[in-house]
Amino acid sequence: MAKITKLEVQKRNKERVNVFLDEDYAFSISAELIYKEGIKVKDSVNSEKLKVLANKDAIIKCREAAIKTIERNLKTEKQVRDKLNLKGYDEDSITKAIDFLKEYNFLDDKDYANKFVKDKLKCQGSNKIRYSLMQKGVSKDVIEEELSSIDKENEKESALILAQKKLNSLRKTEDDTYKISNKLYRFLLSKGYGYDIIKDVVKEAINFELYD
């Protein structure tokens, strides 16, 4: 059984407290945990108590890391989980951190997908958007639900704007309409647009019915 002889708030991180056992530095712990557990100088702690505190502290540190992960921009659950895994946190702490973020609506894959679709629709087709969301770990059902809300005319209009810009660039170095059409087709395909949209957009952009 050891006795807590000193509690010292860290100078560089006021959220962490250095704990001294029997006059010697032993470990640091979250100030939040000190408060919640009612830890005080002169308290006696055994190895089991120290193990419990270490586990709880690990959960708090993981939660704080999760919050920092989403501070600058939205993330999917998979993105947060992957980052926490890379930092070396255990699965139990990660799951609890994820649950915390969800509970306070800091993490919502459906909301993420909705915003992602609206943002990327300006410069990408539904195929590329679908692939990107899959890579980010969004479920297939959520992806398809959000993609089903896309107005095909709006998607086509965005593709046409991109095609016209690309066409202006291609015409500076190429005057063969057939070659331009093929390059334009490949360009739009790389942007994630489907064949039907590409066919119509290429026709409209260069006024050449190559795909009849």
UniProtKB/Swiss-Prot annotation:
UniProt-listed GO biological process terms: regulation of DNA repair
InterPro entries the UniProt entry points to: RecX_HTH_1st, RecX_HTH_2nd, RecX_HTH_3rd, Regulatory_RecX, WH-like_DNA-bd_sf
Claim: Hydrolase is one of the keywords in the record: no
Keyword vocabulary terms for this entry: Cytoplasm
Any one Pfam family match given in the protein's UniProt record, by short name: RecX_HTH1
Main subcellular localisation: cytoplasm
Subcellular location: Cytoplasm
Disulfide-linked positions: none
Gene Ontology, cellular component aspect: cytoplasm
Entry's family note: Belongs to the RecX family.
Described purpose of this protein according to its UniProt entry: Modulates RecA activity.
Name of the protein in its database record: Regulatory protein RecX
Organism: Clostridium botulinum (strain Eklund 17B / Type B)
